[in-house]
Regions:
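Generic beta-strand structural signal
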Residues: 117, 194-195, 274
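Protein kinase-like catalytic core scaffold
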Residues: 135, 188, 200-201, 268, ...
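Active-site nucleotide/adenylate-binding loops and adjacent lid/helix of ATP-dependent enzymes
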Residues: 2, 7, 82, 89-188, ...
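Conserved N-proximal alpha/beta basic substrate-recognition cap immediately N-terminal to
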Residues: 11-114
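C-terminal active-site "lid" helix and adjoining low-complexity regulatory extension at the edge
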Residues: 247, 261-267, 274-317
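Short, solvent-exposed loop/turn elements at beta->coil junctions and helix N-caps
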Residues: 39-40, 177-182, 271-273
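Short glycine-rich anion-binding loops that position phosphate/pyrophosphate groups of nucleotides
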Residues: 56-60, 141-142, 288
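Phosphate-binding site of ATP-dependent enzymes
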Residues: 152-260
Length: 317
């Protein structure tokens, strides 16, 4: 059996189908490696010339939490055998760790949301003097807005976690984070997609009253399309709009590029917003980047074709 040129590690088939279609169109010889049910022999050679990791930290909300540690072990195995891995083990570890993401922003001298990590609500009593409410509760291993909630007091937080112990998943580390005051209906948030260290496109996401800002059509459909998101909304939400943002300021692109380079990602996205008091705050880092085809097309290209073209270059280099 011949070795394919490319192996794409994935867990969510709907998210990856547009990329698979783009690879098929280009005639790329690739293996779609579904890690939901998989095994590998530690004596086996690498299964492809290039490995592209597309695992999502939110796999656990779809009942696939076992895919994440398996994928991390697999990436380490590939790398130890000398494979060329895109968005490899160190990149994946960073995506799984929002504490590390915040620390990276801090170390780069960037503005970031005030954050406190905890594994027991009572431990927060020692930090009450520094707590500010309302605040956002989120898991250290996040994704797709899962397990997030706004809380207005320490007692409310305690009650919430007692009523819904699943909020401690996938690991027993939670974050209480500054609620960044902004206008979601007009200002919204900005997501910048990067490919091979360069900005692919920027888009503005407006009209969101919940936490799921995933740009996948499966999570936030367009028009009459039907989605199948596994992350239910805890509060009524309006339909978000994903708008091209070609006029993103040059100084933002410069700062974002600096942050992206520091992540070590090959492909990914950053999110920031402008607060009501004019702070520009980056708050999220994503290696598994769900592209929005309509945004790319509005700028004159299909973003999935761009990724497929990039992967072809990696294969031939």
């Amino acid at each position: 059996m011949s070795t394919p040129d490319l192996a794409v590690l994935y867990e969510h088939p709907t998210w990856q189908q547009p990329l698979f279609d783009a690879l098929d169109k280009r005639g790329v010889d690739y293996l779609a490696y579904d890690v939901k049910s998989a095994a590998f022999d530690l004596t086996e050679d690498v299964q492809a010339s290039i490995i592209f990791n597309q695992l999502s930290p939110s796999a656990y909300v779809r009942g696939n939490g076992h895919a994440v540690p398996f994928a991390l072990a697999l990436l380490n195995h590939f790398e130890s055998n000398g494979a060329r891995v895109l968005n490899g083990a160190s990149a994946f570890r960073l995506e799984l760790d929002k504490i590390a993401q915040i620390r990276l922003m801090r170390d780069l001298g960037m503005d970031y949301p005030w954050t406190i990590a905890f594994n027991n609500v009572e431990a927060l009593r020692d930090h009450e003097a520094t707590l500010n409410f309302p605040a956002i509760l989120k898991p250290n291993q996040g994704g797709s807005g899962a397990r997030m909630a706004e809380v207005n007091s320490l007692n409310e937080l305690k009650c919430l976690l007692e009523e819904d112990p699943s909020l401690w998943q996938p690991d027993p580390v939670l974050l209480l984070q500054e609620k960044l005051d902004h206008d979601p209906s007009k200002q919204g948030i900005v997501r910048l997609e990067f490919l091979d260290g360069e900005l692919l496109y920027a888009m503005r996401v407006v009209g969101v009253s919940g936490f799921n800002l995933c740009p996948s059509i499966d999570c936030n459909p367009e028009g009459d399309e039907e989605g199948g998101c596994a992350v239910p909304s805890a509060t009524p939400t309006s339909d978000p709009q994903f708008l091209p943002y070609p006029e993103v300021p040059a100084e933002v692109v410069e700062d974002a590029s600096r942050l992206f380079r520091a992540t070590g990602f090959d492909v990914g996205a950053l999110e920031y917003l402008i607060t009501s008091d004019e702070r520009r705050v980056f708050y999220d880092i994503n290696a598994n980047s769900n592209l929005r085809r309509s945004v790319g097309l509005a700028m004159g290209f299909d973003p999935f074709d761009k990724v497929a073209e990039y992967l072809e270059r990696q294969i031939s280099s």
